[in-house]
Amino acid sequence: MTMLTCKPACELPVTKEENRWLVQDLWAEEAVGVIGAEPKSMKSYFALELAVAVASGVPCLRRFPVARRGRVLLYAAEDPLHVVRRRLEGICAASGIGIKDLDVYVITDPTLRLDLEGVRRSLDAAITGLRPRFLILDPFVRLHRIDENASGEVAPLLAFLRELQRRHGLAVLVVHHSKKGAGHMRAGQALRGSSEFHAWGDSNAYIKRTGDDTVTLTVEHRAAPSIPPLTLELATNRVGVALRVVDRSTPSVEPPSSIDERIIAILAESQEPIPFPKLRGQCRARSATVHQRLAALTLAGRVSKSPLGYRLVGGVQELQTRHEEDLDDPDSP
C-alpha cells in the first residue's frame, strides 16, 4: 500500500504578506469563490472591475491595490461581446488606462458546459496555454445543466474548479445568483442552490441593492478579516460607465487638490515621463491614492500616460516630443 505524502508542519511553505492578496482586501491570492447577488445588481460590473485591476495593475475601484498584475481569462455567458468590450472600456477610462493596456482574454465560444468532460479538457488546455492568474466565469447557471440544489451534482463541478486552481496556481471567480426574497438571510446562506457554494469559497463577495442607483458590497475571506461593507454606484464617464465607491466617511488622507498639485508640480519639473513607482515615491502618498488622482487628472486631460510613464499635457516633455516628431516628419513645415 502506498503511503500518503506528508511533511512536518514547520516545513510547510510561508506566504509573505504582500503575496496574500490578488486584490488587496477584496480577493485573496489563488482564492476560489463567488460573487453572489440578485439579478441586475451590478455583480458582473464588479467582476469586470476585478478583471481590469488584475490585468492592468491599477487599483480596483481606484482604491484597492494590486501587488502584481497578471493575465485574466474571462467567460461572460449572458452578454454580447460588444457589450463586454464597452463595459471594459468604461472601467478603463475611469482608471486612466486604455483597453490595449489590459491583459484580458475573453472566451468567445457560445457555450461552456463544465458538466461535460470534453469541455473541461478544453478549458484546462486554454488555461495551460494562456497561463492566467485569474479565471472569471459569469454566471454559474450558464455553465451546466445540473440540479443546483443537489449537493451531489454541484460538488463535483466545484471540485473541478478547485482542481484547476491548485494545478495551475490561479484564482477562480464564479458569478452566482442569490435566492429571491432572501434579504433576511446571511449573505452566504442566500446563495441560490446547494450550501456547497458558500463552503467552497476562499474569498466571497456579496452585493445587495440598497437603492435605485446604489448597492452594498460585503466581502468575506476564509483566512483573513473582512473590510467594512462598501456602498457602490455606477458613474458615467466619457467612454461608458464604471463602479465607484460612495465614501460618506470623513477623508483620512490629504484633500485631492493638494495631491493633484503635488503630482502636477513633479511632472512639470521633469524633462521625461515619470514611471508610476517613482512618481508615487516623490508624492509620498499611498499607491491607491496616487492611482486615483492620476486617473482623475488623465480623464480631465491634464496628464497623459505612455508606456514610459506619466507626463503633463502641454508640459515641457510633451512639447519636446511634438518637436521631435515634427523633425522626423518630412512633410512638416
Predicted regions span which residues?
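Detector for small/aliphatic-rich hydrophobic stretches
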Residues: 1-17, 266, 296
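Conserved inter-motif catalytic segment of the P-loop NTP-binding fold
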Residues: 4, 11, 17-18, 22-23, ...
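Pre-Walker A (P-loop) beta-loop-beta motif of ABC nucleotide-binding domains
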Residues: 29-30
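Short hydrophobic/aromatic beta-strand immediately N-terminal to the Walker A/P-loop
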Residues: 33-36, 73
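Phosphate-binding/switch region of NTP-binding enzymes
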Residues: 34-35, 44-45, 134, 152-242
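The conserved Walker
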Residues: 39
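Hydrophobic positions on the alpha1 helix immediately C-terminal to the Walker A/P-loop
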Residues: 46, 50
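C-terminal regions of RecA-like/P-loop NTPase motor modules
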Residues: 128-131, 166-168, 210-333
